[in-house]
Curated annotation (Swiss-Prot):
The active site is at residues 22, 50. SUPFAM superfamilies: P-loop containing nucleoside triphosphate hydrolases. GTP binds at residues 21-27, 49-51, 321, 347-349, 429-431. Substrate binds at residues 315-321. The lineage of its organism: Bacteria, Pseudomonadati, Pseudomonadota, Betaproteobacteria, Burkholderiales. The gene is purA. The keyword RNA-binding does not apply. Pathway: Purine metabolism; AMP biosynthesis via de novo pathway; AMP from IMP: step 1/2. Belongs to the adenylosuccinate synthetase family. This is Adenylosuccinate synthetase. Mg(2+) binds at residues 22, 49. PROSITE patterns: ADENYLOSUCCIN_SYN_1, ADENYLOSUCCIN_SYN_2. SMART domains: Adenylsucc_synt. Its cofactor is Mg(2+). InterPro entries: Adenylosuccin_syn_GTP-bd, Adenylosuccin_syn_Lys_AS, Adenylosuccinate_synth_dom1, Adenylosuccinate_synth_dom2, Adenylosuccinate_synth_dom3, Adenylosuccinate_synthetase, P-loop_NTPase. It comes from Polaromonas sp. (strain JS666 / ATCC BAA-500).
Length: 446
């Protein structure tokens, strides 16, 4: 006996960053949301920073899926996200002041681990302790993301569902706080965190969160089976993935496409198309190896051009991003671990006016040549990039929406990226504006 569904299931797209984050995922998620009925965050926390420019108005989102800017689209925060209720409501209130309806459209998994004040305190105190001891800082955002994931893996985390049971929450919180205050005061020489303050704030947030709590896994599976197209919105980037990134200079979650299934509660067969977002050059925030890094602080250099014209400052932290040439060997690694279906190249317009462009196709490592990024920060630190030189272009590409309107040199640059990485370019972004996008192949129709 064979079951036959009466409605065709929806098609789903996963959007991931292929570099060290800040690739422009937010704009592309917003653009693709026009063809989807639900947008899902599946990992990370409010350390993410997605900037959208709609009708000239800039909006920065850190926790809520970018689809919130499209009326009628449902937004989901999956179990793979670590949730700061304080930051969530700060973001909700900001959107509501701008006239965006949020609460009736946002569904939050009851299985999300909570980020509480002691997590951020641990994050900040550890970085200070490393610096004082002469150890390199990891470069965390200080938001408590890592410590919250530690509690999850150690099976002691407080989760969103615990907020429904005040007595249970209080008992778990007291035990957890005893542990973390011991570390804060005895090892990191930082102040203790007060139980009553944390508990009272959590109970205030509990009442506000209850209407949005949901079995996100079931809702996503039901919606897709009934024909809804879903968009899974990755945060950070592949080279910040805790397993596949430049460890230990990474975030504390899996940023790769495969985690969209585990972090949202859907089967891997529901991930139909994987779109890798990559800048037309490279950037990185914080410490860690960066083979193609340029001098981005000295005026009248290419690196300075990328930094200033590209407005390369972090959305979440405001820190300057390090800048460098495009790294196709790095992108090969990202394509491999994500199973990319296609690429979207962002910030092509930032390269306007650069006379000569360099593209890294591989590295020299300990006397040998490799055409793919090695595993591990120590090996990557020793990599010497091997460059191809390509002609730049003087014409402006800002706002171009048709591929054949791009300068010939820009087309050649993009074609070479495809050749070296083996991944087709399906979309190109030519400014932060939602409408300044070239579509070569629609992920929802591919």
């Amino acid at each position: 006996m064979t079951y036959k569904p009466t409605v065709a299931a929806g098609r789903n797209v996963v959007v991931v960053g292929t570099q060290w984050g800040d690739e422009g995922k937010g704009k592309l998620v917003d653009w693709l949301t026009e063809m989807s009925q639900g947008v899902v965050r599946f990992q990370g926390g409010h350390n993410a920073g997605h900037t959208l420019v709609i009708n000239g108005i800039k909006t920065a989102l850190h926790l809520i899926p970018s689809g919130i800017m499209r009326p009628g689209v449902k937004c989901y925060i999956g179990n793979g996200v670590v949730l700061s209720a304080a930051k969530l409501f700060e973001e909700i209130e900001g959107l509501e002041k701008a006239g965006v309806e949020v609460r009736s459209r946002l569904r939050i998994s009851e299985a999300c681990p909570l980020i509480l004040p002691f997590h951020a305190a641990l994050d900040i105190a550890r970085e200070a302790y490393r610096e004082k001891g002469g150890t390199a800082r990891i470069g965390t955002t200080g938001r408590g993301i890592g410590p919250a994931y530690e509690d999850k893996i150690a099976r002691r985390a407080l989760r969103v569902q615990d907020l429904k049971y005040p007595e249970r929450f209080a008992a778990k919180l007291r035990e957890l706080l005893d542990l973390h205050n011991f570390v804060l005061t005895g090892y990191l020489h930082a102040p203790a965190i007060d139980f009553d303050t944390v508990y009272a704030e959590a109970m205030r947030h509990a009442e506000l969160l209850k209407p949005m709590m949901a079995d996100v896994s079931r809702e996503l599976n039901d919606a897709n089976r009934e024909g809804a197209n879903l968009l899974f919105e990755g945060a950070q980037g592949t080279l910040l993935d805790v397993d596949h990134g430049t460890y230990p200079y990474v975030t504390s979650s899996n940023c790769v496409a495969g985690n969209a299934a585990a972090g949202a509660g859907v089967g891997p067969g529901m991930l139909h198309y994987i779109l890798g977002i990559t800048k037309a050059y490279c950037t990185r925030v914080g410490g860690g190896p960066f083979p193609t890094e340029l001098d981005w602080e000295t005026p009248d250099t290419v690196g300075y051009h990328l930094s200033t014209v590209g407005a390369e400052k972090g959305v979440t932290t405001g820190r300057s991003r390090r800048c460098g040439w495009f790294d196709a060997a790095l992108l090969k690694r990202s394509a491999q671990v994500n199973g990319l279906s296609g690429l979207c190249i962002t910030k092509l317009d930032v390269l306007d006016g650069i006379a000569e462009l360099k593209l890294c196709t591989g590295y020299e490592l300990d006397g040998h040549i490799t055409d793919i990024l090695p595993m591990g920060a120590e090996d990557i630190e020793r990599c010497k990039p091997i460059y191809e030189t390509l002609p730049g272009w003087s014409q402006s590409t800002v706002g171009v929406t048709q591929y054949d309107q791009l300068p010939a040199a820009a087309q050649k640059y993009l074609h070479r990226i495809e050749e070296v990485t083996g991944v087709p370019i399906d979309m190109i972004s030519t400014s932060p504006d939602r409408d300044h996008t070239i579509l070569l192949r629609n992920p929802y129709a591919a």
